[in-house]
Swiss-Prot record:
ATP binds at residues 29-32, 86-90, 413, 479-481, 495. Its EC number is 5.6.1.7. Forms a cylinder of 14 subunits composed of two heptameric rings stacked back-to-back. Interacts with the co-chaperonin GroES. GO terms for cellular component: cytoplasm. The lineage of its organism: Bacteria, Bacillati, Cyanobacteriota, Cyanophyceae, Synechococcales. GO terms for biological process: protein refolding. It is found in: Cytoplasm. It comes from Prochlorococcus marinus (strain MIT 9515). This is Chaperonin GroEL 2. The gene is groEL2. Together with its co-chaperonin GroES, plays an essential role in assisting protein folding. The GroEL-GroES system forms a nano-cage that allows encapsulation of the non-native substrate proteins and provides a physical environment optimized to promote and accelerate protein folding. Belongs to the chaperonin (HSP60) family. It comes from the Bacteria. Gene3D superfamilies: GroEL, GroEL-like equatorial domain, TCP-1-like chaperonin intermediate domain.
Amino acid sequence: MAKRIIYNEQARRALERGIDILAESVAVTLGPKGRNVVLEKKFGAPQIINDGVTIAKEIELEDHIENTGVALIRQAASKTNDAAGDGTTTATVLAHAMVKAGLRNVAAGANAITLKKGIDKATEFLVGKIEENSKPISDSTAIAQCGTIAAGNDEEVGEMIANAMDKVGKEGVISLEEGKSMTTELEVTEGMRFDKGYISPYFATDTERMEAVLDEPYILLTDKKIALVQDLVPVLEQIAKTGKPLVIIAEDIEKEALATLVVNRLRGVLNVAAVKAPGFGDRRKAMLEDMAVLTNGQLITEDAGLKLENATLEMLGTGRRITINKETTTIVAEGNEKAVNSRCDQIKKQMEETDSSYDKEKLQERLAKLAGGVAVIKVGAATETEMKDKKLRLEDAINATKAAVEEGIVPGGGTTLAHLAPILKEWADATLSGEELIGANIVEASLTAPLMRIAENAGSNGAVIAENVKSKPFNDGFNAATGEYVDMSSAGIVDPAKVTRSGLQNAASIAGMVLTTECIVADMPEKKESAPAGAPGMGGDFDY
């Protein structure tokens, strides 16, 4: 296919046009008075959402070059989402502001490479300052505040997540399910999560989110490598008759057996997913035994005289639901509390008997995984459209609270970045010079962009509010919901430090890449062939 090649200013301007389109679509959702965006779907009802990264993923432009700009900014949003799970809109607004300010300087003749160095140095300085100003989370009130803000000021959601964290611990697993009623409910059940994902992405049942969700599956647990599909045939035939899904957790599944499972999955013969067992050696076996107890099944191991080819349905475990993504597997089981408790007592005894601190630590990990359980939030709503929006907000809120537990919290509502702007200016003037200083000034000018946008979405003058906030103490900011200046921590308007940091780092990274772009190679738009004229009486000539 023929390519189109664009250089210099023309290339950067084309990228900028794409960036403008995406940033504007996403920025309207920022803040407590942010609006919603409607996504048209080829199949099913339109989706009404308020989540930056989901909107960014939907935007595709006709012009290939402008689409490249969209893809770059989308990357800032999705990387922030991967790292912190929230703050995607802030990252987009920041990246857009940095690109706009940077391109003006490049057009005026500044050296893009030196500007990028200045941007990187300023970002490094700011990351240190965010860390300095973050406060560790001490109680469930702060967790509830974080969840409330991330869910778009929904206090009920914040309280529910704080409640869930109280029950399963800060490291515990919180899972989301679509509920059957109008209200959102919290339930704590037996379950565990481990750090292994599906062996092949073809097992994903939801290709948009790239995860496999299997309801009421059978679970086959074995500590051997499955090399030949013949070993699995007897058990697969039995499961196919029941019509239920199957999850295989094994040491490994080799190519031939894996290919057969994938083909059966794609053809719809059997809903199956395969996962490698976590850990190694004896520890792997112990974890598989824990899973067997949890799911009310047996570990099929030759040590116990059990072979795969002789496996029956009675030997398989069962669960309420299993969710598998590329990195983790979450098992939600139920109705097996007695067996789980006695297994936990057994692990506690082993901990008392061992002298090795390493073994003790690993036993403690197993105990936490098994005893912690899983908090399941059943999302309730009147319509499917509302449920999808609520689910995305809840997901953001869960991620934000986990990020807050990790790295602490800072004043929210764009306040932290706005207060850091004068501090950055002072540092840059003292330590940088020439075009590096201009690079740092680009970052400094962009730091107020999220606050300005939050204020504008609430119908206030963003520039005036940003200047007013800068002159106040570090904790004071603008509450866009009420239109007042308040102490952000007391008002419960807080952001996880990790979210603010990730957003800033990813925005600076993408801005640096756009500014140093000198040439774009993209596909030529395909010429649409005009339709041939119809024969007389066939719609080409009209006879009236």
